């Protein structure tokens, strides 16, 4: 149980560092578009990555340690690029998020008498207008996960590397704990953002979110640089 909890805490600490994947989950939650598909992609990707990390950390470290250095520098470039994009969006100060809301009948007094007429609340614009609105967010989640060098660093260096010290059985318990953190985190963030979509869709709020993301990503990039 102690090994499981240790993996859970490490997984949570990695998730708390807001990266491009988490930003996508938040944005799609606010838009209420394809959030379930995005969450499923994130969870399935973590299963595969954590499994690969647990299986392959020793092999990579022993046979091709330069691969980890390449991943580290690619990760630095990736983080800094997204930090610049977030800072740019914050400076533009015009980020607006459109979310979906179903129209509801509203009773209103009729001007001609005591009757009641039915008005429709304005329907907020739906960005896609197709039933397959989840496809693009799902593809974005795949790209931001599998083309993110830091995902491999997390899997091989942190999950695989730290878990290896617990032995053959313990490392899988450790990886299960790390995945449990993902299992809680992504639905909580995605559906939580959907529940708070109205206040979070404000341009002022997103300006500060983008500033925070830029600062955090820059800090993570500096941390990776210092690891060398």
UniProtKB/Swiss-Prot annotation:
TM spans (from-to): 3-23, 37-57, 66-86, 139-159, 172-192, 208-228
Q: Which InterPro entries match?
A: LeuE-type, Lys/arg_exporter
Compartment(s) of residence: Cell inner membrane
Topology in the lipid bilayer is annotated as:
Multi-pass membrane protein
Q: Which UniProt keywords apply?
A: Amino-acid transport, Cell inner membrane, Cell membrane, Membrane, Transmembrane, Transmembrane helix, Transport
Q: Which GO terms describe its cellular component?
A: plasma membrane
Q: What is its main location?
A: membrane
**What is the superkingdom listed in this entry's lineage?**
Bacteria
PANTHER family registered for this protein in UniProt: ARGININE EXPORTER PROTEIN ARGO, ARGININE EXPORTER PROTEIN ARGO-RELATED
Which family is annotated?
Belongs to the LysE/ArgO transporter (TC 2.A.75) family.
Q: What is this protein called?
A: Lysine exporter LysE
Species name: Corynebacterium efficiens (strain DSM 44549 / YS-314 / AJ 12310 / JCM 11189 / NBRC 100395)
């Amino acid at each position: 149980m102690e090994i499981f909890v240790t993996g859970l805490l490490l997984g949570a600490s990695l998730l708390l560092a807001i990266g491009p994947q988490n930003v996508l989950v938040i944005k799609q939650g606010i838009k209420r578009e394809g959030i379930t598909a995005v969450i499923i992609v994130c969870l399935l990707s973590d299963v595969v990555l954590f499994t690969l990390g647990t299986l392959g950390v020793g092999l990579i470290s022993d046979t091709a340690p330069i691969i980890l250095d390449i991943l580290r520098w690619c990760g630095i470039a990736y983080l800094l690029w997204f930090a610049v994009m977030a800072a740019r969006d914050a400076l533009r100060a015009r980020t607006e998020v459109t979310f979906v809301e179903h129209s509801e009948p509203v009773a209103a007094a009729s001007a001609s008498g005591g009757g009641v007429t039915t008005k429709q609340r304005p329907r907020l614009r739906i960005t896609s207008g197709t039933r397959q609105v989840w496809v693009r967010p799902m593809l974005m989640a795949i790209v931001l996960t599998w083309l993110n060098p830091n995902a491999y660093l997390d899997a091989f260096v942190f999950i695989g590397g730290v878990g290896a010290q617990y032995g053959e059985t313990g490392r899988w318990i450790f990886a299960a704990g790390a995945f449990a953190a993902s299992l809680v985190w992504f639905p909580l963030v995605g559906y939580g953002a959907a529940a708070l979509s109205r206040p979070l869709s404000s341009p002022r709020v997103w300006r500060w979110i983008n500033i925070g993301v830029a600062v955090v990503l820059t800090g993570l990039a500096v941390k990776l640089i210092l690891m060398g």
